[in-house]
Amino acid sequence: MERCIAQARKYYAMKGELPFKEDYLKQDAIALNVQRACELCIDIANHLIKTKKLGLPQDSKDSFSLLQRGGLINEAMMASLRAMVGFRNILVHQYQKLDLDIMGDIIEHRLDALLDFANTALAASD
């Protein structure tokens, strides 16, 4: 997960010949790494749910709700992770055109939530 996040940040910061909004290769590289990091969080969440016997999530977003109800993450972390799953769903299923301003905001301000979750999950699994 750390590598995926580092790669996404690296690609975002790279200066290229094209502006970010026109550099589809850079956008795809970032999207793939963010998607992978989100999917790792979902996998970790589902593993914790199973080992702690917290129930059966109805979907990926619900995994984080179950962890919050089980006392393993706080409400702010749950909300942040559910939002990241929503962004991941847009990346994977292309529900709508990718909003590059949102992608930029995620790279600049929201990826640490995934790392925070990984650390929280690691502590909870002890």
State what each model feature region is.
Residues 1-126:
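Solvent-exposed interaction patches of small proteins and small membrane subunits
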